Amino acid sequence: MRAAVLALLLAAALPAIEFKDGYANSNGVKIHYVTAGQGPLVVMIHGFPDFWYTWRNQMEALAPQYQVAAIDLRGYNLSDKPEGAENYDMRLLIADVAAVIKHLGRDKAIVVGHDWGGAISWQFAFHMPQMVERLIILNLPHPNGLSRELATNAKQQEASAYARRFQTPDSHKALTPERLAGWVTDPAAKPKYIEAFGRSSMDAMMNYYRRNYPREPYQATVAPQRLNVPVLMIHGLRDTALLSPALNGTWDWLDADLTLVTIPNASHFVQQDASDLVSKSIKSWLNR
């Protein structure tokens, strides 16, 4: 009993984590982000369908040691939503991340990405390695691995059927905020997701796939360069969209160390399915 009371008193004595909103200008496109904490910069990039709030637990875990900035990707929530698939080209998505880092007065950051945020993070590291201190990827294989599996693995081709549907011109018309929030299991979070998706552009979400996802006939491709930056990959093995065989060979495409954490009971949204384990894995890896 005394231990429980002491724990409550200690928790009450700890300062609450303060979340602050901000906006960066990326060539005329307003990018919303939320920051917490002070220290080395950690930029966190969500995927589909999601928004900055997906990182809430990791932000609280990291804020005592780091300044964490979680981005709303263009098209989502409080960020601008330019029309036209050309405005969701990967080079512009990379520029958005750079704009946030520079807006916060930094030259580089630890970059964390999940799903589309992971795809952007890989490409950011390829094209702007000088701005990446470390790279953390959740449930998005190295581009070499994903393209190989799309070209050769019938199971991954079947698993990617949703992406082919998303690439069609009218795919956004079938989406609603409630449908997009269907994956959210936290009852307290679901209304926040529905509200955020109500502010988002469904067409913009689909433009990520129309502009950047590989199209049939699939071909194995090679990334523009090898990375010489430490990489942590965390992958929920119950992911039905991005299958784990795509992880094989990642170590052959990196010149720095790779740490791979697989979580058997987590699905695609590993940062929420296994929130504590993901947070502890990231903190432990960063504090090596």
PLM segments and residue spans:
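Short, solvent-exposed coil/turn elements at secondary-structure transition points
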Residues: 27, 39, 74, 264-266
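A short, glycine- and basic residue-enriched loop/turn
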Residues: 51-52, 119, 266-267
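Alpha/beta-hydrolase fold catalytic core
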Residues: 1-41, 64-66, 107, 218, ...
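Flexible "cap/lid" subdomain of the alpha/beta-hydrolase fold that forms the substrate-access gate
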Residues: 17, 29-31, 69, 76-112, ...
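Conserved HGGG/HGGXW glycine-rich cap/lid loop of the alpha/beta-hydrolase fold
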Residues: 35-80
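Catalytic histidine-centered segment of alpha/beta-hydrolase-like enzymes
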Residues: 266-275, 279
